[in-house]
Amino acid sequence: MASFPPRVNEKEIVRSRTIGELLAPAAPFDKKCGGENWTVAFAPDGSYFAWSQGYRIVKLVPWSQCRKNFLLHGSKNVTNSSCLKLARQNSNGGQKNKPPEHVIDCGDIVWSLAFGSSVPEKQSRCVNIEWHRFRFGQDQLLLATGLNNGRIKIWDVYTGKLLLNLVDHIEMVRDLTFAPDGSLLLVSASRDKTLRVWDLKDDGNMVKVLRAHQNWVYSCAFSPDCSMLCSVGASKAVFLWNMDKYTMIRKLEGHHHDVVACDFSPDGALLATASYDTRVYVWDPHNGDLLMEFGHLFPSPTPIFAGGANDRWVRAVSFSHDGLHVASLADDKMVRFWRIDEDCPVQVAPLSNGLCCAFSTDGSVLAAGTHDGSVYFWATPRQVPSLQHICRMSIRRVMSTQEVQKLPVPSKILAFLSYRG
């Protein structure tokens, strides 16, 4: 069994350049478990980076200061303590334009977190009440944390203060995602087999419960235009939801094991799902077609082997903001960077016990969290996108596959616009 196809020479694949690392503090002597970093996230405006460093703690650091610290210290021996020192000096130096860092004790093990930013003109989708406890301004930045006890806590990123405590799940909250349109609509995925929709502009009231999963729900993601939601879970489940009507659109079938992560491309034309079956699939969410398969074990395992303990479980997947690259993280101690039109990684990086990953807001850095609560950063593959790709993304942001197929253009252009050529 190999990690790459026989035609590929592993030594010829480019190694990603390490940017830096944030090492978790030593575990308390009375804590034998709970130190995993299950989630990392970048703020939508790139101002903050957050990760769960285990033992109930979430760390919020100004991303620009963190990157500056990496440059000052080089790519090795950079810890969270050095980043802490830099941020603290800036905050005490009277520079008000420098955002402060925060260490947040969430009260229980943190399984998920997500940033949300508000747009004042976006009204609540559910009710229009004159009085609200919270009136979020244009510069409001929130952090949602999903806990082991089923609670969701909402924090003010700039002050580190707790704003809301959302209570309804009866098991751990495995993933959280905010609608990217600034409406502060939050969706939570839980091991209680449900997804719940919360409206933070309505003081955190629950809008809807989405039920279709028969087992744990691992992850969820909004499409860029907020019209669709993807949810994935145990028993090979991949569901697409209409978020205007809160109804299920379709179930995508093809995986052979639990599906644990999902992400949409920036134009909403593609959907990537990662599974314990050693594969990442790229789908067309508008018609359910499978477009691409990224394998992590060769020869490709049979469904029986893929559905078991195959030592190549894919833990995470993330789309780059250029729409050209996908990152995946697997149990073979490797991070892979893929082009959407190639079935072999263009770059790789070593990582033991990886659990999660996320691209920075500008797509230049990938952050990955590990079993011991640390975070590692790599420079991502960068290239100037072609004019054709830029035009394709612009078109696909506003047109579904069905609408594209009706365009009076040559078949080759239709194939390109549909990510089939």
Swiss-Prot record:
GO terms for biological process: intracellular signal transduction; protein aggregate center assembly; protein K27-linked ubiquitination. The keyword Cell wall biogenesis/degradation does not apply. One of its GO terms (molecular function) is ubiquitin protein ligase activity. WD repeats lie at residues 124-165, 168-208, 212-251, 254-293, 309-346. Pathway: Protein modification; protein ubiquitination. InterPro entries: G-protein_beta_WD-40_rep (IPR020472), SOCS_box (IPR001496), SOCS_box-like_dom_sf (IPR036036), WD40/YVTN_repeat-like_dom_sf (IPR015943), WD40_repeat_CS (IPR019775), WD40_repeat_dom_sf (IPR036322), WD40_rpt (IPR001680), WSB_SOCS-box_domain (IPR051983). The keyword Repeat applies. One of its GO terms (cellular component) is cytoplasm. Residues 372-421 form the SOCS box domain. Gene3D superfamilies: SOCS box, YVTN repeat-like/Quinoprotein amine dehydrogenase. It comes from the Eukaryota. PROSITE patterns: SOCS, WD_REPEATS_1, WD_REPEATS_2, WD_REPEATS_REGION. Keywords: Repeat, Ubl conjugation pathway, WD repeat. The SOCS box domain mediates the interaction with the Elongin BC complex, an adapter module in different E3 ubiquitin ligase complexes. Interacts with DIO2. Component of the probable ECS(WSB1) E3 ubiquitin-protein ligase complex which contains CUL5, RNF7/RBX2, Elongin BC complex and WSB1. Component of a probable ECS-like E3 ubiquitin-protein ligase complex which contains CUL5, RBX1, Elongin BC complex and WSB1. Interacts with CUL5, RNF7, ELOB and ELOC. Binds to HIPK2 through WD40 repeats. Probable substrate-recognition component of a SCF-like ECS (Elongin-Cullin-SOCS-box protein) E3 ubiquitin ligase complex which mediates the ubiquitination and subsequent proteasomal degradation of target proteins. Recognizes type II iodothyronine deiodinase/DIO2. Confers constitutive instability to HIPK2 through proteasomal degradation. This is WD repeat and SOCS box-containing protein 1. The gene is Wsb1.
